[in-house]
Amino acid sequence: LRSSPTSPFGRKIKLALALLGLSDQVEIHYADTTNPEDSLRQQNPLGKIPVLVLADGSSIYDSRVILEYFDHLAGGGKLIPADPATRFPALTLAALGDGIMDAALLRRYETMMHEPGCASSKWDEMQSGKIERGLAALEKALPSETGLGVGEITVACALGYLDFRFAGAWRTSHPELVGWLERFAARCPGFAATAPK
């Protein structure tokens, strides 16, 4: 698995591996998304992480597909429900978490890739708006208190990334979601161990 210690999408896969009992079957190798010399671009032409490189040299990407691959290896239906009545709500919740992570990463790259003072405040506001609307939706309809599926994993990784990169600023205005994350972390093996560093 090509990833980085700070990637929320990589964390999602590491957490899925832990929950599925597959962690010991996967080697994790660092990937530098900003280095054009990194073999990452041969493994995923988009140069994005995570990427799962299989024994035959072929690659699977992105995190949604990798998670489904591992769920399939574990017998299916463990993290992604098979029943359409629960499958599509779970995948929709995961899409909301992925969208929050996408917007947070875009905010991070906007400040990281520009000289000080050159980042676009309009772009930052657009991404911040996506994050805030996503958090508001989650605050209004909290994820499951008992589930450890694709939706809950993805939302928890999104919130963890906001804590890591934006000093937990979201917490003040989303108390119900803060409580949910604390309860999720307490019942989810591997959540603390996969925290971004």
Model regions: which residues?
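GST-like domain detector, emphasizing the conserved glutathione-binding G-site
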Residues: 1-121
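Serine-centered coil/turn micro-motif
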Residues: 7, 84, 149, 174-175, ...
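Generic, ordered loop/turn and secondary-structure boundary motif
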Residues: 10, 16, 41, 47, ...
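Non-transmembrane alpha-helical segments in soluble domains
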Residues: 67, 71, 91-94, 135, ...
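Generic structural signal for secondary-structure transition and capping sites
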Residues: 75, 102, 143, 189-190
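GST-like fold's C-terminal all-alpha helical module
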Residues: 97-179
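Short coil/turn segments at secondary-structure boundaries
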Residues: 109, 195-197
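C-terminal end-helix/capping segment
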Residues: 172-194
